[in-house]
């Protein structure tokens, strides 16, 4: 009876089509997911019983544990939808360079399927490499022709830009349209599509500001006002809105476009950063600090670590911003008869960061090693190196291809700069948040003595600084922003 009841309420049986469609998009083993879901489903009654016991014994807030049951029950739908959305975002970021691969191949008489076969062995493409594996699987395992396999994948990707590429190619092949020209048109469209995605993100986070303001500023004020009738302050109730922080942060991660950072931290950097970790514990042990000061110390350690990551981001941006001019110079050298590698050896730049990158590239060429072995902390640069190497192997040193590549990359950089410019307001909000809390809580405490509320100022300021850093710079490691927030907090707490 229990088994039959479980089958009736099993989410796999209720919305199997939706889950299956999600899995088809990114590729997964549905039976493995089903077994995983069956195992974790038995946690639902356990959590319910624990929440009721803790509610009766300790506090009503333990009933909030039942929220976990919602996520467990909808786990198959949530996890497949998240993976699908992540795959879609990665693919959208990779499409411009992929289309340049396809464009070069079309000039050499190779079709789109051949491009996917090449991408399947790529070390750089992640989303499209997975897509290539699924496409090739339909041909090699299911016995479809490459044309019908692309038609099948077009249906899976209906509504996104990759689906449009599939449809455009298959329809173009049917009626004999020139594919190089059509792919160039798609290149322009994909830049427009990225622009729309960035614009949509800016609109969504601007709307989110109102929610953040209500939750993390107005709500604590209201809760504090309600506690005026009591002689004591319930700190848990005042910080209760912060429990929603992970959900909002997760939402921001879902709606954010992929900006392309691929930060790698080596083991030596991790070892160096570990030396400063004991500092907060030592200070706490020696000086018996209040909780707000302990939190501030740990926040300071986080900021130190963020400098390592932010430095890598800055270098990656510098390399990216100089690359269009270098590609244009390579095109000029190709015009007068140089090969791609000899053109790179002739290059000269002023930027310190790019000079180091170029030095690594020259070293690889002189050692006759793959150019794509030079890795940066930004995906699009790594992908362009793989594209250049691919073009060089094919002996297709075409001036116009490099000019087009330079133009596409320059448009991409302008889009990134535009969206970062539009999000600067969040940096200002993060910096002034401690000041707003200081004055708002200061007014409240003057009306009635309610004790020290420094902990509230610290917790909300740190939470919002991390949130705004994520929103405005697409990473929580926005070192300048975090430092300014820390300085404000120190001034407020100590002066």
Describe the predicted segments one by one:
Residues 1-56, 75-85, 194, 208, ...:
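Membrane-interfacial amphipathic helices
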Residues 2, 25, 487-495:
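Short amphipathic alpha-helical segments
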Residues 2-28, 98-119, 144-215, 222, ...:
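Hydrophobic alpha-helical segments characteristic of transmembrane helices
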Residues 10, 92-93, 458:
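Residue-level marker of alpha-helix boundaries and capping positions
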Residues 33, 111, 178, 454, ...:
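Alpha-helical hydrophobic packing sites
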Residues 39-55, 65-74, 188, 194-254, ...:
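Bilayer-spanning, highly hydrophobic alpha-helical transmembrane segments
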Residues 55-63, 231-236, 284-296, 492-495:
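Transmembrane helix interruption/hinge and helix-loop junction motifs
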Residues 62-154, 275-375, 383-386, 397-419, ...:
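Juxtamembrane/interface alpha-helical elements of multi-pass membrane proteins
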